[in-house]
Amino acid sequence: MSDVTTAEFNEEGKYLRKVRSFVLREGRLTKGQAAAMEQHWPAMGLDYSPEPLDLKEVFGRDADTVLEIGFGMGASLVEMAKASPELNFIGIEVHKPGVGACLSVAGEAGVTNLRVFHHDAIEVLENSIVKGSLARVQLFFPDPWHKKRHHKRRIVQSEFAQLIRNTLKIGGVFHLATDWENYSEHMLEVMGAAEGYKNQSLTGDVVERPDHRPLTKFEARGHRLGHGVWDIMFERID
C-alpha cells in the first residue's frame, strides 16, 4: 500500500495541494535498490517534466499504454508488464525504495515495456500525460484513511476522477481495488456520480478480480483470513 499524496479535498472534491507525505517518510535504499536505480533508471526511469510525454518516443513503438498510480514495491506491476508484452506500462511511485525495488525486479525479469516515475502522481497526470492517450489507469490499494475525519484525504474524489478521465481514451478503463469495504463504497459513490464514465459491473457495483491484476501475497493472506478485496472498473464513455 502506498500514499501518492496527502493532499486534501474540499466538500466538492476539489483538489487542494498540501505538503506531501513522502517528504516525511522517504526511506533509505538498500544496496540492491541503489544498484538497480543506477543500472536501470537510464532505460526505465522517466524524469518528471511539465511537458507531455511522447509515448511513441518513450517506448519506441505504438501500443496501448497502462498507467499505475502508487505501485508500492512494484512486484505486481512487473508481473503485469511481463505477462502482457504487447502493452506499454508506466508506473508512478513517490517512495524511492519502492522505485528501486521495482527496477530491480524489472531488470531481473528482463521486461522492456515498463517505465517509471519517481514523482507525485497528481503532477504527472496533470502535466506529463497526453489527454486521451491511456488504455487503462490502475489504482490498487490506496491509503484508505479509515478514520471518518480523514476521508477528505482519500485520493479518490470527484476532481481526481475527472483528471483520470482526461488521460483515458474513449473506451479506456479506470480500475480501482481496495481491501477496505468502506473505501469501496466511497469509490463507487464518487465514480458513479462522475461524468463521462460507465460502471463495467453488470450489477452496478464491484467486479471479480480480472486476470490482468495479479493476486498479491498480502491479498492471498487476506483471503485465507476471510478478508475481502473489492475491484471496481469504470469505462470512459465520453
Swiss-Prot record:
Binding residue positions for S-adenosyl-L-methionine: 68, 93, 120, 143
EC number: 2.1.1.33
PROSITE patterns: SAM_MT_TRMB
SUPFAM superfamilies, sorted: S-adenosyl-L-methionine-dependent methyltransferases
GO CC annotations, alphabetized: tRNA methyltransferase complex
InterPro entries listed in its UniProt record: SAM-dependent_MTases_sf (IPR029063), tRNA_(Gua-N-7)_MeTrfase_Trmb (IPR003358), tRNA_methyltr_TrmB_bact (IPR055361)
Binding annotation for substrate: 147, 179, 216-219
Keywords of this entry: Methyltransferase, S-adenosyl-L-methionine, Transferase, tRNA processing
Recorded metabolic or biological pathway in which this protein acts: tRNA modification; N(7)-methylguanine-tRNA biosynthesis
Record-level Gene Ontology MF annotations: tRNA (guanine(46)-N7)-methyltransferase activity
Catalytic activity entry: guanosine(46) in tRNA + S-adenosyl-L-methionine = N(7)-methylguanosine(46) in tRNA + S-adenosyl-L-homocysteine
Top-level taxon of origin: Bacteria
Active site: 143
Uppermost EC category: transferase
Family, as annotated: Belongs to the class I-like SAM-binding methyltransferase superfamily. TrmB family.
Function: Catalyzes the formation of N(7)-methylguanine at position 46 (m7G46) in tRNA.
Protein name: tRNA (guanine-N(7)-)-methyltransferase
Originating species: Shewanella sediminis (strain HAW-EB3)
Originating gene: trmB
